[in-house]
């Protein structure tokens, strides 16, 4: 087994899976069938995702879609050395996690991983890897305002442009695809004007850092929004499994 998990964590996931999936018995049968043929790592990851997944996603997406995230993430875990330094709770919540915002789940994780693995696998630190990922994001998309539903990573890469919420969705997805815990943060209203912004936080080498998605800097914890964010009355970060 690649994942070194405490027995108590595995028991917690198992219990939550059985209780939560009782609301969707037909989907549970499909998930159980997939899990039965999976190895131990795949099984526990699949159970975790379904154990904390929103009911709308449970019924809306085929088991194979969710399984694609599990397989891509475990493939990455086996081949990217620094991924094994990520604590289990962060791995499940901020790496394995399939959703960032309200984007479609588009099975993009494996594709992004293949795009990035050779650029990050030999990086000496996770900070260096995170910076490289953001350079890749900058190569794929730039900013344009919009009010439509959040584009998924494939949509962003195909259109090559999107608002800050879509740029950060792409960046979080890219970070997770190569084993860097990441989450989207946003301010619903700035203190100084009637506007908002979203950016990315990553866990690298033991600490959380922020960065502007698709806005690469030579270091983390730097962005055009630094001063404004320090004055914000409310900063949100939601966990979407």
Regions found by a protein language model. Give the residues of each.
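Secondary-structure boundary elements
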Residues: 3-159
């Amino acid at each position: 087994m690649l994942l070194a998990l405490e027995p108590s964590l595995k028991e917690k996931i198992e219990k939550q899976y059985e209780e939560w999936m009782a609301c969707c018995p037909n989907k549970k049968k499909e998930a159980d069938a997939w899990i039965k043929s999976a190895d131990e790592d795949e099984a526990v990851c699949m159970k975790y995702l379904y154990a904390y997944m929103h009911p709308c996603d449970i019924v809306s997406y085929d088991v194979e879609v969710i399984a694609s995230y599990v397989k891509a993430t475990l493939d990455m875990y086996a081949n990217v050395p620094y991924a094994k330094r990520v604590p289990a709770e962060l791995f499940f919540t901020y790496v394995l996690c399939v959703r960032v915002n309200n984007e479609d789940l588009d099975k993009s994780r494996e594709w992004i991983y293949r795009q990035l693995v050779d650029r990050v696998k030999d990086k000496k630190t996770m900070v260096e890897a995170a910076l490289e990922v953001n350079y890749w994001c900058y190569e794929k998309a730039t900013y344009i305002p919009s009010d439509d539903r959040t584009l998924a990573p494939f949509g962003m890469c195909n259109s090559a442009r999107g608002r800050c919420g879509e740029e950060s969705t792409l960046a979080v997805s890219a970070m997770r695809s190569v084993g860097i815990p990441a989450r989207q943060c946003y301010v619903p209203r700035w203190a100084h004007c009637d506007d908002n912004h979203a950016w990315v936080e990553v866990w690298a080498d033991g600490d959380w850092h922020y960065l502007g998605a698709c806005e690469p800097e030579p270091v983390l914890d730097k962005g055009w929004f630094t001063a404004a964010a320090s004055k914000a009355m409310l900063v949100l970060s939601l966990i979407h499994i």
